[in-house]
């Protein structure tokens, strides 16, 4: 007997049906990758509108748009040496082992993708893989807790080096899958991303899931200096590929919310109700502090210190800084508080000081207002110097005549420009220290009103009086400067030569060589 061994390769086919486990609906346009394990040859197939696929030529001819990857395209695997041509009379798959891997698409999004194997062993036999069901993936869950990385508070002082940490807990992810968590800071008022230097403030991390709970620290490092009074919400998004697996974007979620407080201050004198005070033994300055965006129910400490505007250092009175503080519990997110500073301003004429305020929560600074150039925080202590001259002699010597005219030039410093002031001068007998009076017994006074064009300047006050009775005596001109009828500067030095006009027994416009004064002895 003679036996003939055929070298014809066995070829077969396979078929499958795809359905959704949750609703038992057939799933169309689901792609699979079919790979021959022996040769590595690989092609894409796709289910039709009934969720069905068959490689049989009777269903879709192998020669029809061969390996096009569509639901109605033919499938053909060649031989190991690549010599097998497409033949609609035989099976699409040569003898061997194959893998079948479901590929992600919109129609199976959120489903657990199938991955399996099958074998072709018999010629002209179709392997029925059966019904492949898509079980839904577990839906990832995100929970977050945002706070300041340094203090762990959700209330943060605006600064150039803010570091917000969002502790993100992620559960129910698919083991082996690469995920990316991306966080964005959102302005709660506008619902838009917080922008710094034209860019949104974001943070992201990528991880490969092991199927267990994942906890990640998301750091947002940025300049929050401009966010005083703002509330921001940290929004997180979990993705794999271009698919959004989970989000935590609730703008009302307090755990995701960060508060940036803001304070503004206005300092005024208790007498003038303005930014002007008198150099006196007792000045009372009230600093009205307006705050916004505090956490209600928390207890805060408001601390103030007076700063010398000229030096930028703390203002010292009797060698000590001038400070004040108060504690309060915020009943509302926004409100006002008043700090009162009572201190001795004697010797501070001509100076300006600025009130600096700091707001703390349990010793952690959450807001400050420290602008040395902020006029609203500034108090000015005016100063005045006077120079009296006789209108006739042009020096501070007058003739003992019936009508003496004197001009007292008041040089002022440190006024607030644009405001109206009044200078009130009084002529005082240097010998008695009492004001001069006219024939009717009225004190000899003169006033001048002016609006200060600048902080420093001068104004003339005119005096006219009977000098006949003052021969051999001197008159000193005291000047007071008022703002809204409140005294803000005084120059009243009985021994100040510049304020003094002499009325000698014998009038001379030169100094006596023996007395070195404008007074000369008769005889």
Language-model segments: which ranges?
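Solvent-exposed loop/turn and edge beta-strand elements of beta-rich ligand-binding domains
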Residues: 1-523
